[in-house]
Amino acid sequence: FVRPNPDTKRVPSTVFIHENGIRFQSPLRTDSRIDILFSNIKNLIFQSCKGELIVVIHIHLKNPILMGKKKIQDVQFYREASDMSVDETGGGRRGQSRFRRYGDEDELEQEQEERRKRAALDKEFKYFAASNGLLTVENTFRDLGFQGVPNRSAVFCMPTTDCLVQLIEPPFLVINLEEVEICILERVQFGLKNFDMVFVYKDFNKPVTHINTVPIESLDFLKQWLTDMDIPYTVSTINLNWATIMKSLQDDPY
């Protein structure tokens, strides 16, 4: 599947690798396709289905392309990792202890089969992402991830080698770390359970990126990660007025 989808219906489609790019072709209409040139790909990111419901190849573009009348800068190919749902409540086995052993064995077999499927899916997607050899494939580091709210809902953000991303819930988030001038950690106060992150870019005409409501437990780890990534950071006890700050920086960048 692809996101965003050029069709109104979601149908499994085919992705082809050509010499100079990637083509997504819908089976519904021959004119329903997405063409992406390798020269226009800024980041090619693979996200495993470990801990997620889908496996993802995400493409972040240098220049937006048109889909219908919409400009898009992110295209994502994904596949659902599981078509099985496991009853995690255990309610189905209540009062059936006589059959419990067999139920457990079935569930164990199901889980093993799902693990096998997920591993095969990860391998397949990773191989596809790497198969053109012209681009470096970035992987997400789940153990370095943290919860935050870049848009309206709480999501799990993860770093790659060069980016900070959120690729599961649209709108997607891709922050290129080399473009970041400074990160401001806002609302860092004793007694508060969370804080906000603001990424200011070297290009002052680019709007800042907010990731709000990050659990305070992630603060020390994120400070260390920013240091490791050579990104300067500063800590503020309040939320700053970024519209005013950015306007003054644009008017007088020096």
Model-derived segments and spans:
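Classical protein tyrosine phosphatase
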Residues: 53
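N-terminal recruitment modules of adaptor/scaffold proteins
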Residues: 1-34, 48, 56, 60-254
